[in-house]
Swiss-Prot record:
InterPro entries: UPF0352, YejL_sf
Annotated GO CC locations: cytosol
Record-stated family: Belongs to the UPF0352 family.
Designated name of the protein: UPF0352 protein YejL
Amino acid sequence: MPQISRYSDEQVEQLLAELLNVLEKHKAPTDLSLMVLGNMVTNLINTSIAPAQRQAIANSFARALQSSINEDKAH
C-alpha cells in the first residue's frame, strides 16, 4: 500500500534535486554524502523533535530507510 504524504511529489522531487545538486557541486563521494546526510537527519531530529519522541522517530526513519533499499545486485 503506497504511503500518503502531505507533500506533493513535485515538492519532494524539487528538494531532492537541489540537495543532489549541492552534493554534485562539491564532488562529494558516496561515503561523505552519506555522512553529511546522516548528520543532517540527526540534527533535524535533535533540534526539531521533542526529546521523548526522538528515539521512536529515529527508529521509524531507520525502518523506512531499510525498507526502501533496493536489493538489486547491480552497482
